[in-house]
A protein has these predicted regions:
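Active-site proximal beta-strand in glycosyltransferases
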Residues: 161-167
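Glycine-rich NAD(P)-binding loop of Rossmann-like domains
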Residues: 177-184
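Ligand/cofactor pocket segment of small-molecule handling proteins
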Residues: 198
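N-terminal FAD-binding dinucleotide-binding subdomain shared by FAD-dependent oxidases/monooxygenases
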Residues: 2-15, 20-160, 176-177, 190, ...
Length: 541
């Protein structure tokens, strides 16, 4: 359906949904089936969210395919076949498109529509959103499905207009194929997108220069073609596994919880456990080796050093190996990266690593990248510099109420939410996997489904009681923020300058944004709030 056909009777909407990623699509499906007049507004030209924009070489999910999928329809989860253990971006995007087609969602999606502002009127309890083209539409409720990693960050360096070569960002990758053959390519950043793309870029490029400020831990994914017997066994118990996932810390079933401290076993036993997890592949498996890897620094040191020794054993040049060894954060306190041949790539003669912590980048020049001690001549620069995570997309929209509440002021010192779903002073505005919810520290699709189901139940409660307005109480929000901080402070997570803390964005407040009390504890809290008549919320006509 064309955008013109989708633009119909905007004032009759019950729910406006912003974003057509996995959260937005499920919200549309769920609410539409309950009889709500809902529509999605999406900046991109099609569905997919992060999987639409992130098309860089090697882009792949770090959650296994059989888990990273919707559970709301059994026929859907039985019929779709995943080709690999970990889904690559093209396959995941195919899956999301299949979901949109199977449930006829596109007829209620307006693409190529970027939301500029959202304003709430207390007079009629309605949100009015305005697009960058000046179009306006209103609804009783607004659901922000804007994603946690959807606002790409590019450093504020001089010289972007001076560089004569090509510039790309992994988070805004072109839809056409990019050929690196014969090119001198610079990759800036060694987070997830850098680690995933560098080995593939190196297979084509004449020379690759990697600019690294901070080394990150990366584990082997051990990706492989999907084994038919594994898929069949998994699908045979899908319903049980999906239910069990809600009783785990990360929302993924199938990982028996550890029972011992890393400090209660011998060094030989400890290293054998790490070796087994390393061979198995996957981040959760490794962090599940012992009970205290994310809460005890001494215990974590053993896991961190094991990983560093793996880097030293893989990278032949020991100076390069040491530069690739992370020392400034405990393993797991930044998002663990999964890779295929990342460290092996540095053994290639045409791949160099530049330490820009000791010699920072000053900017771009006509020829390439200038650091404080050298200029590197390049034909292409790939920025793998991450995102303004968790809050960036929301703050790009001018969200305010006629009572004077503004999102910029609200989150000036860091995000404040109740349950990561709503905010005090912003009635009828819901978030899917917002800050202070498990979101990015969980199986994201499961968390999206849990939030959408909770929001749908909330709207049904309002409808059944003849009410139309809901907003968190300030005290409930304050208590939840304090709880989120206390839970994080009981772990090692705040020790890392991570995007979880907003540390990758200059001037962004340093506050740990995800909820790390676990999916099980979080869902129980959300369910208890609802069961108590939406405790902590003010509900009115």
């Amino acid at each position: 359906m064309s955008d013109t056909e989708a633009k119909r009777d905007n004032d009759s909407l019950d729910v406006i949904i912003v974003g057509a990623g996995v959260g937005g699509l499920y919200a549309l499906h769920k609410l539409r089936n309950l009889g709500y007049r809902a529509r999605i507004y999406e900046a991109a030209g099609d569905v997919g969210g992060t999987w639409y924009w992130n098309r860089y070489p090697g882009c792949r999910c770090d959650v296994e395919s059989l888990e990273y999928s919707f559970s709301f329809d059994d026929d859907l989860q039985q019929e779709w076949q995943w080709p690999e253990r970990y889904g690559g971006q093209p396959v995941i995007l195919d899956y999301v498109n299949h979901v949109a087609d199977r449930f006829d969602l596109r007829k209620d999606i307006q693409f190529n529509t970027r939301i500029k502002s959202a304003k709430f009127s207390n007079a009629d309890n309605r949100w009015t959103i305005t697009t960058s083209d000046g179009e306006s539409m209103s609804a009783l409720y607004c659901v922000m499905a804007t994603g946690n990693l959807s606002t790409p960050r590019k450093p504020d360096w001089p010289g972007f207009d001076d560089f004569k070569g090509r510039i790309e960002h992994t988070g805004l990758w072109p839809h056409c194929s990019v050929d690196f053959t014969g090119l001198r390519v610079g990759v800036i950043g060694t987070g997830s997108s850098g680690v995933q793309s560098i080995p593939l870029i190196a297979k084509q490029a004449k020379h690759v220069t990697v600019f690294q400020r901070t080394a990150n831990f990366s584990l082997p994914a051990r990706n492989e073609p999907m084994r038919a017997e594994k898929e069949a066994a998994h699908k045979a118990e899908y319903s049980e596994r999906r239910e069990a996932a809600y009783f785990t810390p990360f929302g993924i079933a199938g990982f028996p919880p550890p029972t011992q401290s890393a400090l209660d076993v011998s060094e030989e036993e400890r290293n054998a456990a790490y070796e087994s997890k390393w061979a198995e592949g996957g981040s959760i498996s490794y962090l599940y080796a012992f009970t205290d890897l994310l809460t005890n620094k001494t215990a974590n040191d053993t896991a961190s050093e094991f990983a560093r020794n793996k880097i030293r054993a893989t990278v032949k040049d020991q100076k390069t190996a040491e530069l690739l060894c992370p020392y400034n954060h405990p393993i797991g306190t930044k998002r663990l990266i999964l890779d295929t041949d990342y460290y092996e790539t540095y053994n290639l003669d045409h791949v160099d690593l530049v330490d820009v912590r000791s010699a920072p980048i000053e900017g771009l020049t006509e020829k390439g990248v200038k650091t404080t001690d050298a200029e590197y001549e390049l034909d292409m620069i790939v920025f793998a510099t991450g995102f303004d995570a968790m809050t960036g997309a929301m703050k790009e929209i001018d969200i305010q109420t006629d009572a004077g509440a503004k999102i910029g002021a609200k989150w000036e010192d860091g995000p404040r939410t109740y349950l990561g779903i709503m905010m005090a002073d912003f009635p009828n505005l819901f978030m899917i996997t917002g800050p202070q919810s498990p979101g990015v520290k969980s199986q994201m699709i499961l968390s999206c489904e849990q939030h959408v189901d909770w929001i749908a139940d909330c709207l049904e409660h309002l409808r059944s009681t003849g009410k139309s307005k809901i907003v968190p109480e300030t005290k409930a929000e304050d208590d939840w923020v304090a709880h989120n901080n206390a839970v994080a402070d009981a772990t090692l997570y705040p020790l890392a300058n991570s995007w979880y803390m907003g540390a990758n964005i200059p001037g962004k407040p340093r506050i740990f944004m995800p909820y790390v009390g676990g999916v099980e504890a979080y869902k129980k809290r959300c369910d208890a709030v609802a069961a108590a008549g939406y405790k902590g919320f003010q509900i009115s006509p």
